[in-house]
Amino acid sequence: MGKISKAVRGVADIYNGASLIVRIIVGLIIGTVLALTMPHVTWIGEFGTLFVAALKAAAPILVFVLVASALAQGTSKLDRRFGTVLFLYLFTTFLAAVVAVLTSRLFPQTLSLGKAAKADVVPQGLSEVIQTLLTNIVANPIQAIIDGNYICILMWACLFGLAMKSIANESSKAFMANVADAVSQVIRWVINLAPFGIMGLVFTNVADNGLSAFTKYGSLLLLLVGTMLLMVLVFGPLVIFIFLRRNPYPLVYRCFKESGLTAFFTRSSAANIPVNMQLCEKLGLDKDMYSVSIPLGATINMNGAAITITIMAMAAANTLGIQISLPAAILLSVVSALGACGASGVAGGSLLLIPMACSLFGISNDIAMQVVGVGFIIGVIQDSVETCLNSASDVEFAATAEYHAWLKQGRQLPAFMYSKKERAKLGIEA
């Protein structure tokens, strides 16, 4: 028995000693191989289901206790940096919609429309999306934690934290801080099991879908993914460069390696909140800031969603022979950006906001829902890339706002933001 326990400890030490990224890549490879060789062994996919469920269950509690604890301690500093984060989230979402309009004009797409998709809730206009957001803000806080309604969670956490700050004694505040630390530790344990979760998620996707999504709608999918990559590799980094005046790609690479990879397979910005918070800690960001900005980003920083809504609406217009003027294209960018900010509050996310954008061009709801149906077909890949972009950029822009403030204060940035030559000159170790 002693030999068995010793062997188990040895395996655990090897597992924990390896980099999380390396373990995730190994899980990805194993999941793909198993899906191609043993697609009938469906229980392997349960690892992915359990992993995503655990993250989704823990994330709302984590957000509530971190924000409430920070405010109760009196350490929350929602200063000018928060305004910068908010601006970056909203501006880049609009920029993503503009980029999508440009790529759609350069590479116009048409659709082969078939049976209309069915949906329980479809927003009919921008006013309905805004109304949904406002309603979500004042929802029941317990129900908000159950549903993962982060706008509501943030509001109640702020109110609860401010109330605790004014009436609670030091021992109560210390207890809240301990609860926040305990929840954070639980999240670390869950994230440590990410390789098994990724293995299950990859297994399910490959076994169920294979490469079928590429065959019928390959050009549309290529435009969607290409536009998102353009935002990731060109326009997003350009915004970061304007604020930091230095090479943005070390930060971009770090965020996509540690946040985007996980988000690609979980396909949920909410489930990736704990991963993003852990990454923010590694990047040296202020906990009082990122505990608010990251869950807010998961709600309103929707670059990928804005791209999806815009391109699908433009494709629908092209299919029906509708000529889109420049003013109409600009209006579409605004509507797509605002609508994308409400994607987290709508069942089905960005795809079910397509009819709202289509309504700008007088496209009937029946036809718009057929476009949604096409979206569901390519959704396995489109949604993965979209979530990857959305989630990784949450950290990118939170870090950009923080580092921008550091530079104004004369502080040095983390070592990875400097070149080898600069590190040697400044005496910084990598």
From Swiss-Prot:
HAMAP family in alphabetical order: Ser_Thr_transp_SstT
Molecular function GO labels: amino acid transmembrane transporter activity; symporter activity
Catalysed reactions, as listed in the record: L-serine(in) + Na(+)(in) = L-serine(out) + Na(+)(out); L-threonine(in) + Na(+)(in) = L-threonine(out) + Na(+)(out)
Role of this protein: Involved in the import of serine and threonine into the cell, with the concomitant import of sodium (symport system).
Family under the similarity heading: Belongs to the dicarboxylate/amino acid:cation symporter (DAACS) (TC 2.A.23) family.
Phylogenetic classification of the source organism: Bacteria, Bacillati, Actinomycetota, Actinomycetes, Bifidobacteriales
Keywords from the UniProt entry: Amino-acid transport, Cell membrane, Membrane, Symport, Transmembrane, Transmembrane helix, Transport
Provenance organism: Bifidobacterium adolescentis (strain ATCC 15703 / DSM 20083 / NCTC 11814 / E194a)
Membrane topology value: Multi-pass membrane protein
InterPro entries listed in its UniProt record: Na-dicarboxylate_symporter, Na:dicarbo_symporter_sf, Ser_Thr_transp_SstT
Name of this protein: Serine/threonine transporter SstT
GO cellular component: plasma membrane
Any GO BP annotation: serine transport
Transmembrane segment boundaries: 24-44, 47-67, 82-102, 144-164, 186-206, 223-243, 294-314, 320-340, 361-381
Subcellular location per the Swiss-Prot or TrEMBL entry: Cell membrane
